[in-house]
């Protein structure tokens, strides 16, 4: 399994620590051809995992737009509002992910390269 640190420095740690509670956040991105599932634990470690039975959040949409989202080129809110991306999961988990994406611009890039 590939692992990347969400928290690059102490400064980010101060902002993200309240978001990273004791439970692991499982997020699945399902495109037309393939799916990517990542977990983010309470230490801020993010790693690719095999798709679980259930994720906290599952995103369905166009593969290209999902990649743009993960690279930080387009906002999650924009894709959801335009209807390009469908979301299944809790509102709390969605808000948590949106906050993490906002505070760590494009942090998924590190895990996609591996």
Curated annotation (Swiss-Prot):
InterPro entries, per the entry: SCP2_sterol-bd_dom (IPR003033), SCP2_sterol-bd_dom_sf (IPR036527)
Gene3D superfamilies named in the record: SCP2 sterol-binding domain
Bilayer-spanning residue ranges: none
Lineage start: Bacteria, Bacillati, Bacillota, Bacilli, Bacillales
Domain SCP2: from-to ranges: 21-101
Pfam family, one: SCP2
The protein, known as: SCP2 domain-containing protein YusD
């Amino acid at each position: 399994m590939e692992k990347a640190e969400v928290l690059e420095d102490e400064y980010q740690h101060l902002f993200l620590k309240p978001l990273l509670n004791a439970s692991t956040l499982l997020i699945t991105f399902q495109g037309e051809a393939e799916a990517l599932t990542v977990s983010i634990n309470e230490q801020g470690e993010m790693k690719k995992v095999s798709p679980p039975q259930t994720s906290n959040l599952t995103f369905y949409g166009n593969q290209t737009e999902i990649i743009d989202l993960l690279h930080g080129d387009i906002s999650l809110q924009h894709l959801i509002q335009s209807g390009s991306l469908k979301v299944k999961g809790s509102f709390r988990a969605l808000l948590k992910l949106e906050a993490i994406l906002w505070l760590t611009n494009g942090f998924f890039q590190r895990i996609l390269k591996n």
